[in-house]
Amino acid sequence: MATATDRAPHQVQVHTPTTQRVDVPRRGYDVSGGGIKTLLPERGPSTSQIIAVLVGVPTGGTLLLLSGLSLLGTIIGLAIATPVFIFFSPVIVPAVVTIGLAVTGILTAGACGLTGLMSLSWMINFIRQVHGTTVPDQLDSVKRRMADMADYVGQKTKDAGQEIQTKAQDVKRSSS
């Protein structure tokens, strides 16, 4: 059996750190040396972006000003109206409840009417699907029946005219 002294010695390689260093780029800094310029786009903004800014900033500013004025007016109005509401609350509360109930009733009636119309529309569409005919098909059928009836009436009128003519000739022959 082989012992540890019989074996050839093993060589172990040890790697020492090299002088090369991997730099992790930090935010806002480019290793290539471009500095802050690398953060900027290579070309300027497009014409549509410039127009959007020129239109958007004044419009947004105006709307912000109007919303601020609206908020200010609401706060002033609430500050003035609060004592009035407290003073007249025995009258205002029942009036608000009455108006609220009336509006709720009107909206409920409208919703019920709309639901009824939708149900009627659904039933009509369901019946059309059950019968397998649609309005254009029914109109074509009615047109064909009207044309057939017109042909029939025309033929009957022609037959009646010939019969009258035949009888008139018979009367003329018998009287001569």
UniProtKB/Swiss-Prot annotation:
GO cellular component: membrane; monolayer-surrounded lipid storage body
Positions of post-translational N-acetylalanine modification: A2
Transit peptide in keyword set: no
Keywords, ordered alphabetically: Acetylation, Allergen, Lipid droplet, Membrane, Transmembrane, Transmembrane helix
Coiled coil: none
Biological process according to GO: lipid storage; response to freezing; seed oilbody biogenesis
Record-linked InterPro entries: Oleosin (IPR000136)
Tissue distribution: Expressed in seeds (at protein level).
Subcellular location: Lipid droplet; Membrane
Region annotated Disordered, chain positions: 156-176
Chief location of this protein within or outside the cell: other
UniProt similarity note: Belongs to the oleosin family.
The protein's name: Oleosin Ara h 14.0103
